[in-house]
Amino acid sequence: MLVVKKTPKIKGILSAPPSKSYTHRAVICASLANGISNLKNPLNGADCLSSAHACEMFGAEIELSNETWVVRGSELKTPDNIVDIGNSGTTLRILTGISSQISNGYTVLTGDDSIRKRPMQPLLDALNQLGLTCFSTKNNGTAPIVVKSGKISNNVVEIRGDVSSQFITSIMMTLPFSENDSEIVLTTPLKSEPYLNITIDVLDKFGVKIEKNEEKNKSGYKIKGNQKYLPCDYTIEGDYSSASYLVAAGVLLNSDIVIKNVFKDSKQGDREIIEIVKKMGANVEINEDHVKITGPYKLKGIEIDVTDIPDLVPTIAVLGCFADGKTVVYNGEHVRLKECDRLAACTTELSKMGAEIEEKKDGLIITGVHKLNGAKLKTYHDHRLVMAFTIAGMLADGETIIEGEDSVKISFPDFVDNMKSIGSNIEVI
């Protein structure tokens, strides 16, 4: 458990951890490339390590260290055992598509209790459209998932754009194996597009080209067939999702902090946290590779469309508690499909602290109360809730006890130590 007490001031220099999204994609791409790739500044978090270990089961040789992962990619082989991806939904979804391209046999992918409840049916349906064979062992669209090796025989696949972007990423990373050119057709407006931009960016670095379909009245992507993944040296940038908690702490508390390893020209959608706090009234200094914050700032509630930034919702919920007026979060139905239902979890747990939050079908309405009280909070094994609630606890009267702090190892393994280094009053017990 994590015990958090009111923190009068934070000061110091921090580095945002490496991007989880970029690390996942880079290690999988490197494993598919015949040769050696050096991945610099990888995230050594539990989810990304799940991707690395799973890639080893498909034939890659990977030397892991804190500074660099050396990946020797090769032709995909049939795993010798069930592929257990732990708690990593990204690993499960991307490798469900990729595993169809082993030379023969079957792959079985599964994970922990939480993963075995995560929806997979839209991806399974899409892959089956391509002539591949994959299914849930329970016939309910959840893991364990069985995938048969096979050739892609149909080259147009339709999928909703408002489901998890990880499904579309999986298809994007699988279709280059097709002998023919392929097309992904989105049947509904796209959500979480920045994550697909990250996928396209990483694929490009590893020699695979994806084109956005610019035809009128047709939304989707075009992928050339017979493309080869090529090895490269790749440096992974800092993670704006994880930096959002540091930004929130900086604008809400008496602070003088510098957050390094976040880039002004990043393709990450969650860089929007900088614009959000600016619109709320914070004067944040954004530079080429770092952010400087001298708080606190008087914030005002605003309306925020979270279509492309679902991972920022817990951070926004905490910011809204300390803003004048109402903060409205909308277009966030997909936020319910993360590690937990984050809309319900934020409402339930922050309300225990005295927050005034109304849960809507697609979002939240947070009325600023400017004062929270310590409470015992559940986090539902969700790393983002642990970190967001920690910031709330640093501003609350009394003691806040947060369960499940171990989950931060997924995306920000050094979160507690980093926060303590700048003066945060937190302790693991």
Curated annotation (Swiss-Prot):
Which pathway is it part of?
A: Metabolic intermediate biosynthesis; chorismate biosynthesis
Q: Name one GO biological process term.
A: amino acid biosynthetic process
Location comes to:
Cytoplasm
Amino acids binding phosphoenolpyruvate: 20, 89, 118, 166, 342, 384
What does the record give as EC number? 2.5.1.19
Residue positions binding 3-phosphoshikimate = 20-21, 25, 164-166, 192, 311, 338
The active site consists of 311
* Reaction(s) the record says it catalyses: 3-phosphoshikimate + phosphoenolpyruvate = 5-O-(1-carboxyvinyl)-3-phosphoshikimate + phosphate
Classification via PANTHER family: AROM/DEHYDROQUINATE SYNTHASE, PENTAFUNCTIONAL AROM POLYPEPTIDE
Assembly description: Monomer.
Q: What's the protein here called?
A: 3-phosphoshikimate 1-carboxyvinyltransferase
Gene name for this UniProt entry: aroA
